[in-house]
Amino acid sequence: MAKSLLIISRQAPWNGPSAREALDIALAGGAFDLPLGMLFLDDGVFQLAAEQQPTAVQQRNLAANLQALPMFGVEDLFACSHSLTRRGLEADNLVLPVQVLDDAALTALIARFDQVVTL
């Protein structure tokens, strides 16, 4: 059986390639039916914000790719409640439905996976 993988995305979509790379890993892993989840933490929650204008800063819009995650079998999607609140985001206004977790639940989530990649 394949080891489970948690991808933690901590970078805003306009702050370099890390957000795109985390998404690419998730889509590739999902395409191969790997057991994986994706956690949006710190500035990574900005990837989930609706109505972004990435072209204004010459970046690619990740919203369509994020919305493709469930089609690739990546359904375990999580966001840190503290990160959302601190950045003025609400779970109801995100481009993708995610499970919002508090700090204790985040610790349990990370322990649940065999391998963790942070970008």
PLM ranges: what are they?
Residues 36-42, 76-83:
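Short internal beta-strands
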